[in-house]
């Protein structure tokens, strides 16, 4: 039986999820590992992600393929 967390993982990131890039996005000067927040879903395959500095100032907003995003978790979850 698939849990809700596994279902969500298979569908990709949700709105307001914190994500990390799995590949560089050179067109937007973003490198693998940079962290952002999903701010909009642009169809089934793409999410709009906002990248901010430590003070919360956005320095990039880029459409990202959902397969290029890793959802980050800040509390323990069962694997």
Predicted feature descriptions by range:
Residues 2-7, 13-78:
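Basic/aromatic-rich interaction segments and small domains that mediate binding to polyanionic partners
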């Amino acid at each position: 039986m698939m849990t809700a967390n596994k279902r969500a993982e298979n569908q990709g990131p949700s709105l307001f999820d914190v994500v990390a890039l799995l590949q560089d996005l050179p067109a937007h000067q973003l490198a693998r590992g940079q962290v952002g927040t999903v701010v909009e879903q642009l169809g089934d395959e793409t999410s709009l992600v906002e990248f901010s500095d430590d003070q919360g100032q956005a320095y990039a907003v880029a459409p990202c393929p959902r397969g290029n995003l890793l959802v980050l978790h800040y509390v323990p979850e069962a694997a």
